[in-house]
């Protein structure tokens, strides 16, 4: 039976086509990979053991954190592939995704490749300036971005497969996965968020989006364009920061209660905002107002 595969591109879920679980397994098995045993079976392009081990370590630790907290059991596999072995049959190199119990991550890229892949030329000058001011390296920033989004992808697995929640729209589906990731990093590896937050701040403040409304995100999704889509995700990080101050470790359990899988209700953005703001004193509404002001003249 064929199942629709959903891909996330730095948090981006795109339904590309119907690909059976066995086909995804076959595509990965066609690659010549080495393997790391452990709690999470990890397959990687030869020559990239170090980064594969880093991904395996952080994903394993995040799984332990959430299994202990939620009394659930994760069952995922990890593929870490370079540009030559990337699953171009599914999506171009540079994008990480979750599908059918696989977390598919790349082995990284240099700064030039990062800027070009994600269309960040217009904010490069500000990125350079902030990296220099903060005494952080571009390599550290890129690594932190992929680490954070590796757990974001794990969040999609958790919310979709293991939780009692059903995200009411694309916006909630994405920021809830980022919350899942950030809760782990806030509590276990807070320093890893420093250069990630630097990037999100520069992207949020200096990229000029064509689209900035929640309705645009829900309707156009990937169609907003990769740079604009990434800008949305950078903004989602700051929404998560607001929400964490309100909910801390209780957000996901509250999310399950407010947006249960059994629900058949169609919620508007206003409905969702009111629900989230029950404990946040209007901060979510304020965040949306600021977000949507970016394209208002």
Report each predicted region and the residues it spans.
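Active-site recognition of the HExxH zinc-binding catalytic motif
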Residues: 148-164, 178, 182
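Metzincin-family zinc-dependent endopeptidase catalytic domain
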Residues: 87-134, 138
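Short pre-active-site segment immediately N-terminal to the catalytic Zn-binding motif
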Residues: 128-149, 163-169
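Post-HExxH zinc-binding segment in Zn-dependent metallohydrolases
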Residues: 168-207
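Pan-zinc metallopeptidase signature
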Residues: 211-297
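Acidic/histidine-rich, surface-exposed loop or edge segments in extracytoplasmic proteins
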Residues: 32-51
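Zn2+-dependent metallopeptidase catalytic core
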Residues: 47-81, 85-88, 92-101
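Bacterial Sec-dependent N-terminal signal peptides
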Residues: 1-23
């Amino acid at each position: 039976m064929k199942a629709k595969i959903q891909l996330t591109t730095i948090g981006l879920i795109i339904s590309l086509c119907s690909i059976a679980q066995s086909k995804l397994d076959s595509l990965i098995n066609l690659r010549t990979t080495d393997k790391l045993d452990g709690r999470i079976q990890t397959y990687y392009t030869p020559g990239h053991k170090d980064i594969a081990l880093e991904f395996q370590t952080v994903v394993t630790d995040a799984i332990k954190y959430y299994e202990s907290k939620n009394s659930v059991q994760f069952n995922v596999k990890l593929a870490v592939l370079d540009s030559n072995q990337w699953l171009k049959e599914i999506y171009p190199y540079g994008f990480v995704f979750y599908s059918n119990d696989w977390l598919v991550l790349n082995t990284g890229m240099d700064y030039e490749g990062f800027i070009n892949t994600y269309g960040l030329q217009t904010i490069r000058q500000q990125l350079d300036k902030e990296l220099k001011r903060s005494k952080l390296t571009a390599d550290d920033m890129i690594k932190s971005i992929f680490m954070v989004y590796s757990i974001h992808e794990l969040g999609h697995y958790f919310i979709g497969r293991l939780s009692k929640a059903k995200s009411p729209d694309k916006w909630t589906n994405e920021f809830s996965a980022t919350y899942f990731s950030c809760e782990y990093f806030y509590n276990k590896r807070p320093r890893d968020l420093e250069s990630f937050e630097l990037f999100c701040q520069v992207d949020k403040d200096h990229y000029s989006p064509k689209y900035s409304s929640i309705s645009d995100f829900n309707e156009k999704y990937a169609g907003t364009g990769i740079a604009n889509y990434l800008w949305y995700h950078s903004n989602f990080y700051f929404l998560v920061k607001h929400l964490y101050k309100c909910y801390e470790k209780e957000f996901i359990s509250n999310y399950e209660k407010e947006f249960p899988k059994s629900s058949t209700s169609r919620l508007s953005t206003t409905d969702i905002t009111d629900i989230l703001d029950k404990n946040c004193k209007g901060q979510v509404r304020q965040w949306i107002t600021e977000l949507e002001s970016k394209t208002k003249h």
